[in-house]
A protein has these predicted regions:
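Catalytic core of non-heme Fe(II) oxygenases with the double-stranded beta-helix
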Residues: 89-210
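Double-stranded beta-helix
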Residues: 193-237
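Non-heme Fe(II)/2-oxoglutarate
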Residues: 1-95
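Acidic, low-complexity intrinsically disordered regions
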Residues: 47-48, 64, 135, 139, ...
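Extended, compositionally biased low-complexity polar/Lys-Gly-rich tracts
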Residues: 18, 32, 62, 77-85, ...
Length: 237
């Protein structure tokens, strides 16, 4: 597999069933996630940007193997994420190898949440990919809930509408955000995420930023974002 594939590709699958969706719904959503992490210049955690999540898998850092467990955000290791990944690997070409998977979780958004624009990998990490899987078995375009992808000026360049079993594979350095549903749909929008990069790179990022408190690169208020890199990515599409 080459990380030059799937810069921003959409695939429609027959993955979702009512039975699978019920398994997703019944997962314990005990933790919250935010796209706007605290920084030295803005140390306060923005509670209004948080939303519910279920962590399925987290990589184990060499420096502190119990790091995620001690923080209370360890993966549940529910077999569900591996079963779905096995299906995706048969349907979608050129996915990264499994041993590059470092995180998997289900995010829950609903009307009134306010997720932020973010990137999944810092601009200098070329070998990365994110997979999003839309899990709701029924979705009406009137309900909103799109994933928005932005260019180097943070102008919207592409919107991907939820659809049962729809999968998006993309370079995580592209700024993006999930939109909540409109007032027409006052229930949960479920999305499963898989995140990849080489194990060596993920370990180094952990050591630099979690253990040694190295400040992250930031531009336009987005951690890891670099306009020139994003401009180049869009030019390659």
């Amino acid at each position: 597999m080459s990380y030059t594939d799937n810069i921003l590709n959409v695939y429609d699958t027959n993955l979702i069933s009512e039975e699978l969706f019920q398994e997703i719904v019944l997962l314990p959503y005990q933790f919250t996630r935010t796209d706007n992490v605290p920084t030295k210049d803005n140390p306060n955690l923005e509670l209004d940007g948080m939303y519910w999540t279920h962590q399925l898998y987290n990589f184990t850092p060499i420096d502190d193997p119990d790091y995620w467990q001690n923080a209370g955000i360890q993966g549940s290791e529910n077999q569900l994420y591996l079963d779905i990944l096995t299906y995706l690997e048969t349907k979608i070409p050129n996915l990264p190898p499994r041993d590059h998977l470092y995180s998997s979780y289900v995010n829950v958004l609903r009307y009134g949440n306010s997720p932020g624009i973010h990137v999944d990998a810092p601009y200098f990490v070329e070998e990365n990919r994110t997979i999003l899987v839309y899990l709701n078995p029924v979705w009406n375009p009137q309900w909103g809930g799109e994933t928005i992808f932005f260019d180097n000026d943070l102008d919207c360049r592409r919107a991907v509408q939820p659809r049962a079993g729809r999968v998006v594979v993309f370079d995580g350095r592209i700024p993006h955000t999930g939109r909540t549903s409109t007032i027409r749909f006052l229930y949960n929008r479920y999305v499963l995420a898989y995140k990849y990069m080489t194990p060596e790179t993920r370990q180094k990022l952990f050591t630099d930023h979690e253990m040694n408190n190295k400040p992250p690169v930031m531009d336009k208020g987005i951690v890891g974002f670099d306009p020139n890199t994003v401009k180049t990515i869009w030019e390659k599409m």
